Amino acid sequence: MATAGSAASRRDPGRPCPFSIEHILSSLPERRPATRPPQPVGGRNPAELDEPEAPVPAAPCACCCCCNPRAATRGTPETSSGPGLRLAWPLRLAPATPSPLTAPRAGSPALTGTSGPGPQRRTRRHRTIFSEEQLQALEALFVQNQYPDVGTRERLAVRIRLREERVEVWFKNRRAKWRHQKRASSSRLLPGTKKTPKESC
């Protein structure tokens, strides 16, 4: 190639050959800014070292230390390892996430916890006022059977003009009252249990 270059220079000393080494080397600086091939650090000038640092922060993402070399060198071991930098995305999304979550919390659990169960319990605690005829029919069946089946309760409910659910609840309450009365009567029969509270008073 040196011989070809020297032959070309001998032929036309005023105009260099387009394929000569001098022509190729002179055209390389014009193409370097466009292509920017990787070169060793030792071969670069101080001006060339400063040029790639300007576009570096814009090209990589700033969320992790793997993409951003400046974050790895600048940050402490805690921030460069990830906990501080990885939380950048959740912290950015934090204002958007509480809005849908706070709406149901304020609507359903808070309101149902304070005002919701109150009215529901009051509606469930609505007491039915039984007439004398209804109470007599219920007591008569209770004497015969303390645990009537569904069919018996339905027939009684139709006869006394009540719902079967009310009849079932009445029998549950009546059985609880009967057990309480039975315990009270059994405690009265035992003299030791009654004397001890009187003596203590």
Swiss-Prot record:
* Keywords for this protein: DNA-binding, Homeobox, Nucleus
Q: Where is this region: Disordered?
A: 1-55, 95-124, 179-201
Tissue specificity of this protein: Expressed in adult testis.
Q: Which InterPro entries does the entry mention?
A: Goosecoid-like_HB (IPR051440), HD (IPR001356), Homeobox_CS (IPR017970), Homeodomain-like_sf (IPR009057)
Query: Is Iron among the key words of this record?
Result: no
Q: Does the keyword Metal-binding apply?
A: no
Function as written in the Swiss-Prot or TrEMBL entry: May have a role in development. May regulate its own transcription. May bind the bicoid consensus sequence TAATCC.
UniProt name for this protein: Homeobox protein goosecoid-2
What is the native source organism of this protein? Mus musculus (Mouse)
